[in-house]
Amino acid sequence: IGGYSLAGLFALWCGYESDLFTAVTAASPSVWYPGWMDYVGHRKPKAGRIYLSLGDAEAKMKQPVMATVADNITALYDMLKKYSDVRSFLEWNVGGHFREPALRTAKAFVWAVGW
């Protein structure tokens, strides 16, 4: 399962709640969402493969809650690396949230299927 932006956050949530998905792709996920980091801090994902990506300019937001996105995705990736049975990957892309979403989503799914 995978998605971009809020759909990316939903895909991550699915990967924590259900064992139906072996891989999760989350391109520019809305990990700034209030409560998300507390949620993942107390759970282990059920998906065995998790791909994250974010644009390097996404944290340059005027809205303070949304500006936490880069710190949160880095913290999430650090959490995922603690699990030896979860393969995770974080890719930093050039630009903001709306730069090349189709390409970034495609790259995520290519990673998920192992090509």
Report each predicted region and the residues it spans.
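Primarily recognizes the serine-hydrolase "nucleophile elbow" in alpha/beta-hydrolase
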Residues: 1-45
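Short catalytic/ligand-binding loop motif for oxyanion handling, primarily in non-cytosolic enzymes
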Residues: 9, 60, 98-100
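Cell-envelope and extracellular/periplasmic
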Residues: 14-16, 25-29, 48-62, 93-95
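Loop/turn elements at helix/coil->beta-strand transitions in domains of secreted/extracellular proteins
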Residues: 20-24, 47-49, 84-88
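Short aromatic-enriched loop/helix-cap "lid" or pocket-rim segments at secondary-structure transitions
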Residues: 38, 64-65, 102-105
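C-terminal catalytic histidine-bearing segment of alpha/beta-hydrolase fold enzymes
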Residues: 53, 70, 74-115
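Short, flexible/disordered intra-domain loops and linkers
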Residues: 59-71
